[in-house]
């Protein structure tokens, strides 16, 4: 079973550790370099502790960290970052976590993937397509990023 646990400020270091894995995965799609320390530049998480519309969640499976999600709530709600540890791939955990997020923030959603990240595009098309019964809009921006838009309030899981 997948659980979303809101990240507390005192757990910021744990989230930053997971973000290192996330950024590493992104180096396949974008030119991201390590810093002299041997780490990737950390994310600025301060706004997550002060801004009411920014939300960070650990994705947990049976008490074990399986990933994280970062959301900006509003109109539309936006998946800012979403990561599942590779050992949890293809077990439905990402889909379950995404559906829980859609339910937590009912309304319009926008989900974007970078140009070369075909695995993410395929994942989100499948998840959103299944969730909405195929009733979503997909477009591409000037950077060839794919963007899916839909309203989760219309398809809330009972």
What residue spans do the PLM features occupy?
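A short beta-loop-alpha structural element at the N-terminal edge
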Residues: 2-17
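Short secondary-structure junctions
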Residues: 4, 131-139
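Conserved GNAT-fold acetyl-CoA-binding loop/helix
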Residues: 23-45
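A short helix-loop-beta-strand connector motif used in the catalytic cores of GNAT acetyltransferases and
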Residues: 44-57
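Conserved beta-strand in the GNAT
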Residues: 58, 64-72, 78, 83
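Active-site beta-strand termini and strand-to-loop segments that position acidic
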Residues: 60-62, 150-153
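Conserved acetyl-CoA-binding loop-helix of GNAT-fold acetyltransferases
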Residues: 84, 90-103
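Conserved beta-strand-loop-alpha-helix junction that forms the acyl-donor binding cleft
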Residues: 110-125, 129, 139-143, 147-151
């Amino acid at each position: 079973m997948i659980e979303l646990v809101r990240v507390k400020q005192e757990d910021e270091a744990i989230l930053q550790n997971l973000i290192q894995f996330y950024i590493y995965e992104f180096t396949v799609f974008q030119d991201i370099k390590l810093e002299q320390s041997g780490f990737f530049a950390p994310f600025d998480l301060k706004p997550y502790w002060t801004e009411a519309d920014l939300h960070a969640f650990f994705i947990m499976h049976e008490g074990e960290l399986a990933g994280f999600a970062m959301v900006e709530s509003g109109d539309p709600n936006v998946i800012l970052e979403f990561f599942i540890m590779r050992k949890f791939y293809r077990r439905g955990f990402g889909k379950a976590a995404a559906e829980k997020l859609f339910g937590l923030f009912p309304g319009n959603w926008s989900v974007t993937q970078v140009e070369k990240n075909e695995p993410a595009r395929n994942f989100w098309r499948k998840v959103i397509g299944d969730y909405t019964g195929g009733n979503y809009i997909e477009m591409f921006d000037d950077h060839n990023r794919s963007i899916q838009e839909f309203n989760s309030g219309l398809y809330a899981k009972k």
